[in-house]
């Protein structure tokens, strides 16, 4: 357990964050860590508005760089998902400085675009996990506490239960992974346990995403696929005739990819941490300290 105060920068490369989140998250950090309260800094860009996005493309990219390239921060935390990371990821990656590699990066859903690019570039403390805005969910305090525990202490209890440090892992939203495959963002997934989750899609769209994912030569080298929760599934007319687990098993069989069962991840407060790579997610907070 680190005795140093962790400094966490929150940025929103996609959609705007609710202003209520900053107050609630900061208060939770104070309650959970009274003797070493993390300094959680919400970049002003999190609250900006530019159409669908939390500021225009350059503002969102620059905010990420402000935190990632600042040596005083230990971690970069995504404010929320939404949509927009794909519009800024290449601009961000081309301007990251060497010190940005000494930080942890945590998010999920749309953030998978940036997590994939960071992992591809050799960053060692990249993880799928709850975002700041998850505090607004029912049970959201537990979700945010989980991410804080991983960022501050690399707490093993925050991890998805099958993550053991011995095997390589990666986790993505299905739609996000399907869209980044075949682009310069695609990471090497050879030998990884690949965990997938989805939200707000009809079964035919889940089926189509899994066709694309499991057809990819890189994905066909994974050690297996695990399915997280698929929530808020929209109606399929007519009924698709298969559920999400049956669809995933079908495409795994077609592609010759081992089906490894269910994963404890999803768009909900029970979403667990999945580090990208072969360990618990890179150096401890002490090692990441400026």
Model segments located where?
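ATP/nucleoside-binding phosphotransfer catalytic cores, i.e., glycine-rich phosphate-binding loops
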Residues: 229-290
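N-terminal glycine-rich "phosphate-gripper" loop used for MgATP/nucleotide binding
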Residues: 75-88, 108
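Conserved beta-alpha junction segments in alpha/beta enzyme cores
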Residues: 21-24, 168-199
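Internal helical hairpin/lid segments
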Residues: 188-237
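Short, acidic/small-residue loops that bind anionic groups at enzyme active sites
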Residues: 94-117, 125-131, 254, 258-260
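ATP/NTP phosphate-donor binding region
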Residues: 1-72
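Conserved anion/nucleotide-ligand pocket segment
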Residues: 123-182
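Charged helix-capping and loop-helix junction motifs
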Residues: 56-61, 208-213, 239-247
């Amino acid at each position: 357990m680190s005795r140093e105060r962790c400094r966490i920068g929150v940025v929103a490369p996609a959609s705007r964050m609710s202003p209520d989140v900053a107050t609630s998250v900061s208060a939770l950090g104070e309650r959970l860590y009274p003797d070493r309260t993390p300094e959680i800094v919400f970049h002003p860009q999190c609250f900006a508005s530019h159409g669908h996005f939390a500021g225009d493309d350059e503002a969102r990219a620059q905010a990420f760089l402000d935190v990632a390239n600042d040596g005083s921060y230990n971690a970069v935390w995504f404010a929320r998902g939404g949509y927009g990371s794909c519009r800024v990821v290449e601009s961000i990656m081309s301007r990251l400085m060497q010190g940005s590699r000494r930080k942890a990066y945590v998010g999920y859903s749309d953030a998978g675009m940036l997590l994939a690019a960071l992992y591809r570039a050799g960053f060692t403390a990249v993880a799928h996990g709850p975002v700041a805005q998850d505090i607004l969910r029912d049970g959201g305090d537990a979700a945010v506490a989980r991410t804080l525990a991983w960022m501050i202490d690399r707490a093993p209890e925050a991890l998805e239960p099958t993550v053991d440090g011995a095997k390589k892992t990666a986790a993505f939203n299905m739609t996000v992974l399907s869209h980044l495959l075949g682009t310069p963002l695609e990471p090497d997934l050879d030998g990884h346990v690949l965990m997938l989750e989805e939200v707000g899609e009809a079964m035919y769209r889940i089926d189509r995403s899994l066709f694309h994912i499991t057809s990819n030569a890189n994905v066909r080298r994974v050690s297996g696929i695990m399915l997280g929760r698929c929530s808020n599934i929209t109606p399929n007319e007519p009924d698709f005739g298969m559920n999400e687990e049956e669809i995933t098993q079908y495409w795994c069989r077609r592609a010759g990819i081992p089906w490894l069962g269910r994963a404890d991840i999803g768009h909900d407060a029970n979403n667990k941490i999945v580090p990208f790579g072969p360990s618990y997610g890179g150096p401890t907070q002490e090692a990441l300290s400026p």
